[in-house]
Amino acid sequence: MYLNEFSDGLVARDMSDHPEFASLKQSAAELGISFSEGAGYASRNTVIRHQRFHFLEWGDVDKPTLILLHGSNQSAHSWDLVSLHLASRYHVLALDQRGHGDSEWNRGAHYTIADMALDVEHFIAAEGLTSPVVCGHSMGGMVTLALARSRPDLMKAAVIVDMGPETNDEGTRMIREFVGRNIEFDDMEEFLDRVVKYDAYRSREHIRRTLKYNLIQRADGKFVTKHDRRRYLVNEGGKARVAGVPGLDELAKLPMPLLVVRGGESKVLTADAASRFVDAVPTATLRTVPDCGHNVASQNTAGFLDAVVPFLDGLG
């Protein structure tokens, strides 16, 4: 059983009057995140590459488009505070990537970064988007880099959040271990206790309001995390699921403006690795956001916006 509301067909569902939206606005007010009361907010589905994808649409379609790609084990809702703030100036599309959130799980368990990058390419075509900015966090950052390498003509600019061609093994191991230890729960409070212990940057109440987007309830009453765990398996032909991620030598050829955003206390993207990344790419700049770890946009939303908005506004 799903715990959150979303469109169950190809007709958009207006979420602007839903209690979930009221809860989000309450979180934004408590965190000092400004937003426009009139910003449009809808849940939508599309079918691309023979698979149903769910996404959240914010703002006016006549505004510049920003595509948001979430990290591993997360969903489009991980961007809600960011989307709410930006909706007055941008047409924001936050995609639930394959096997995540409210999108369909892939029948063949094909979850390489190359697969996901091709999904985004087809999503851009299906929505008729012209030169969007693509912003990806963690896994979504890898997808953004892969798309930038394969189809640089599709995007106006890219924002990479706490990810790069070099990552710290300790940081990625900590994430894998947390995910591996937290699969099913007797009740939502059990999951909440574990997330609060793991993520010291967000308040318990803020985390509580987002739980419904990360869990589903099975027929036996257990709560389980809402993503396809098969994606951790090795894909066909012996290719690891990270197949398709470009290296520094390939990224050096990227023609579009690139912003790298690092969490100041991140254990995934070290300061040295971030510096090597931007030094290798002539079009890249680096912004470090204090008081947050790997999940920059949710752990310090105001700081993330301070880093990203000037970059977006400067694109013209």
Spans of features found by a protein language model:
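Alpha/beta-hydrolase fold catalytic core
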Residues: 1-64, 88-90, 129-130, 309-316
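Active-site loop/oxyanion-hole signature of alpha/beta-hydrolase fold enzymes
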Residues: 39-42, 48-58, 83-87, 93-135, ...
